[in-house]
């Protein structure tokens, strides 16, 4: 298959590109490199630098006889969605509408969309099924839900003259290698790892008893690849998480232990809670098990160890790059 991956230079997208190429697919990548890194994209992919919110940029990638689109590109920071809501709206909603417009123009048979756990309310039952009410409490969650509705409504249009098969993945807290270590606005595990590597205090916002459902990147990629040609996923929404909860306090302790520290010898501080922070999060992954045949295989302990090994190496590489640039 010829597959376009938007956001393919980013954390999740680049791992998906790697797997697709290994399985023999031809992959087209588009990324604006706002948070993605060009070096994440394997040599076997056709690369376009551009913004999904610019339909002309996007159409360059669409003109490659595509069989499917994996739309992952987006603004993914809850905090930045509050400080810059128009950018959040432009990237997540307008960008998705642009993807849909071109899917219609080119009669795209298949679209997979990266939705988010943030569309659920803090009062959702635990574990949370896909049928739970969607009442996002952050601007980011609002834009992800709006984009998801655009995707599903477009696929259900009675005036379409072709089969447009879509699947939406509500992804939980994805972690693993290539996660940002220097972005204080997204990815709590990456933030904590970056803090440790730079010798900075770990900051927990709120009381730390809020929970997250952490799922390893390899498991996420397996779900996406499996869904591409599986009719049971057409027109469906799936939660992608581990099905387990971990408090932010527990996460802090795990990360400290990974670096042979405890709270007694490393600074861990608390700060006021931030807006848009869901209190308790846990995915019900029954539908993914039944219809996708998917099961997360990587335990948090194993995934954390792999991520820490990568982070230590990446931090060293980044330091060497900075030193080399200063010497020029």
Name what the model sees in each region.
Residues 53, 83, 91-94, 131, ...:
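Residue-level signal for the nucleotide or nucleotide-sugar donor/cofactor binding architecture
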Residues 122-123, 139, 180, 184, ...:
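Active-site "substrate specificity/gating" loop of NAD(P)-dependent dehydrogenases
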Residues 146, 150, 154, 188, ...:
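Hydrophobic alpha-helix immediately C-terminal to the catalytic Tyr-X-X-X-Lys motif of short-chain
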Residues 197-328:
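C-terminal substrate-binding subdomain of Rossmann-fold SDR/epimerase-dehydratase oxidoreductases
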Residues 81, 132, 161, 166, ...:
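A conserved pocket-lining segment of Rossmann-fold NAD(P)-dependent short-chain dehydrogenase/reductase
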Residues 1-174, 313-314, 325-328:
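N-terminal Rossmann-like NAD(P)+-binding domain of SDR-like oxidoreductases, especially those catalyzing
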């Amino acid at each position: 298959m010829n597959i376009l991956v938007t956001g393919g230079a980013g954390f999740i997208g680049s791992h998906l590109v790697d797997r697709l190429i290994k399985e023999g697919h031809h992959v087209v990548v588009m990324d604006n490199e706002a948070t993605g890194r060009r070096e994440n994209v394997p040599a076997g992919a056709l690369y376009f630098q551009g913004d999904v919110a610019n339909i002309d940029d996007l159409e360059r990638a669409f003109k490659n006889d595509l069989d499917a689109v994996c739309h992952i590109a987006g603004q993914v920071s809850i905090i930045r969605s509050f400080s810059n809501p128009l950018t959040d709206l432009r990237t997540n909603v307008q960008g998705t509408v642009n993807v849909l417009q071109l899917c219609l123009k080119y009669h795209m048979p298949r679209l997979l969309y990266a939705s988010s756990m943030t569309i659920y309310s803090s009062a959702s039952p635990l574990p949370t099924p896909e049928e739970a009410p969607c009442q996002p409490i952050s601007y980011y969650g609002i834009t992800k839900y709006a984009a998801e509705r655009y995707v599903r409504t477009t696929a259900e249009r009675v005036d379409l003259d072709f089969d447009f098969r879509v699947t939406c993945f509500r992804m939980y807290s994805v972690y693993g290698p290539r996660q940002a270590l220097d972005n204080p606005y997204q990815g709590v595990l990456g933030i904590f790892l970056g803090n440790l590597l730079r010798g900075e205090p770990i900051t927990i916002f709120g009381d730390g008893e809020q929970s997250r459902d952490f799922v390893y990147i390899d498991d996420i990629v397996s779900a996406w690849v499996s869904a591409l040609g599986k009719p049971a996923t057409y027109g469906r929404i799936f939660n992608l998480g581990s099905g387990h909860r971990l408090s932010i306090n527990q996460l802090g302790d795990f990360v400290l232990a990974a670096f042979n520290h405890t709270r007694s010898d490393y600074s861990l501080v608390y700060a006021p809670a931030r807006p848009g922070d869901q209190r308790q999060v846990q995915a019900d992954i029954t539908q993914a098990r039944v219809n996708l045949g998917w099961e997360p295989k990587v335990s948090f302990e194993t995934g954390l160890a792999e991520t820490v090994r990568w982070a230590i190496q990446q931090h060293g590489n980044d330091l060497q790059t900075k030193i080399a640039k200063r010497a020029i």
